[in-house]
């Protein structure tokens, strides 16, 4: 088997989520208000009990409150917020508890289907709980009986959000504050997978019955041209086919179209649910075998086995009128069919490098 985009493994660093950054900065700003002490480091406890110290970029008093910021270090995770300034602006209020607001660069929820209600700042439940627990402990330590108003912001967050799925999810004005463990694990892409699940939830909550999970922009364009689906029905799954298929077990839809490049679909057809080259490779001998089942001669099968890429294998098959794209889609559909509930109508589409549909199975 050949890997079309080989990568050299290297040691990778862990990082911290925007939720951890928000917790650290809100705690530092609140502590300044209650004690008069401005910190340059702040200790927080992550949801699984780990204690971490986070460095602050600033911690200072403001008119009527205090603010603190930190530079988000995502480690070696491919994250649009890596290096961004995450900050909290805190005011003391009479009513106990914590009230959250969206500061500059943090979005507001405008569609049903997410874990946060419509009209609320896009600060997810675990970061909210982390901040609430840390601020409650601080208040108890200093005998403070009032509450806190906390606005979380991200510098340049509105522009960064355009590189995420937030606009499609109906989160407007900026980024989401995320995290379930407080730690960013390198290449776990947990935030990306969570956004896939959110996309499905939002589609369902808004009455969408046919969703299309696509590996990239070209496959989205192909599905949009074929079916005229609205953006809310398009799920950008990237390489995470398994994240879509497994989630549909508990959040079912009437109809699912899976669309991707021929090479990606051939990986799914071979049973791989993570389509990235780190985790799965193009299986040219298997493509040759499938071509043989579709009528390819022994000579053509040999040429496919010796091909440099999946696209070359496809071109060879098409030149001899062998429907390799349809065969791959049929196998990919079978893999998907084994995972999703029986009531889901599953279709698979494969496209070539020019975005043309070269395989269909339904």
UniProtKB/Swiss-Prot annotation:
One of its GO terms (molecular function) is cobalt-precorrin-5B C1-methyltransferase activity. InterPro entries: CbiD, CbiD_sf. Pathway: Cofactor biosynthesis; adenosylcobalamin biosynthesis; cob(II)yrinate a,c-diamide from sirohydrochlorin (anaerobic route): step 6/10. This is Cobalt-precorrin-5B C(1)-methyltransferase. It catalyses: Co-precorrin-5B + S-adenosyl-L-methionine = Co-precorrin-6A + S-adenosyl-L-homocysteine. It comes from the Bacteria. The lineage of its organism: Bacteria, Pseudomonadati, Pseudomonadota, Betaproteobacteria, Burkholderiales. PANTHER family: COBALT-PRECORRIN-5B C(1)-METHYLTRANSFERASE. Keywords: Cobalamin biosynthesis, Methyltransferase, S-adenosyl-L-methionine, Transferase. Its EC number is 2.1.1.195. The gene is cbiD. NCBIfam families: cbiD, PRK00075.1-1. Belongs to the CbiD family. GO terms for biological process: anaerobic cobalamin biosynthetic process; methylation.
């Amino acid at each position: 088997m050949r890997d079309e985009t080989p990568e050299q493994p290297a040691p990778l660093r862990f990082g911290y989520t925007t939720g951890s950054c928000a917790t650290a900065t809100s705690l530092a700003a609140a502590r300044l208000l209650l004690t008069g002490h401005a910190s340059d480091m702040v200790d927080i406890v992550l949801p699984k009990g780990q204690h971490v110290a986070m460095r602050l970029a600033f911690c200072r008093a403001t008119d009527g409150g205090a603010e603190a910021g930190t530079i988000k270090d995502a480690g070696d995770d491919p994250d649009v917020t890596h290096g961004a300034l995450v900050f909290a602006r805190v005011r003391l209020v009479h009513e106990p508890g914590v009230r959250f607001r969206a500061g500059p660069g943090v979005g507001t929820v405008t569609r049903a289907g997410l874990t946060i209600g419509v009209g609320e700042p896009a600060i997810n439940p675990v970061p909210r709980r982390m901040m609430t627990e840390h601020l409650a402990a601080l208040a108890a330590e200093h005998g403070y009986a009032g509450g806190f108003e906390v606005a979380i912001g991200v510098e340049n967050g509105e522009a960064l959000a355009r590189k995420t799925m937030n606009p499609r999810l109906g989160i407007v004005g900026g980024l989401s504050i995320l995290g379930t463990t407080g730690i960013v694990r390198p290449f776990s892409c947990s935030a990306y997978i969570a956004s896939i699940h959110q996309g499905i939830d939002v589609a369902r909550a808004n009455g969408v019955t046919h969703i299309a999970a696509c590996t990239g922009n070209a496959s989205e364009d192909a599905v949009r041209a074929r079916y005229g689906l609205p953006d809310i029905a398009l799920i950008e799954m990237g390489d995470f086919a398994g994240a879509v298929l497994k989630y549909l077990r508990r959040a079912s839809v009437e109809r699912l179209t899976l669309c991707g490049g021929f090479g990606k679909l051939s990986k799914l057809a071979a049973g791989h649910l993570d389509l990235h080259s780190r985790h799965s490779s193009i299986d040219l001998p298997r493509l040759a075998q499938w071509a043989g089942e579709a009528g390819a001669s022994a000579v053509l099968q040999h040429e496919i086995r010796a091909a440099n890429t999946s696209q070359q294998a496809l071109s060879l098959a098409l030149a001899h009128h062998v429907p390799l794209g349809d065969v791959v889609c049929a196998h990919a559909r079978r893999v998907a069919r084994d995972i999703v509930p029986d009531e889901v109508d599953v279709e698979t589409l494969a496209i070539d490098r020019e975005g043309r549909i070269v395989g269909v199975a339904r």
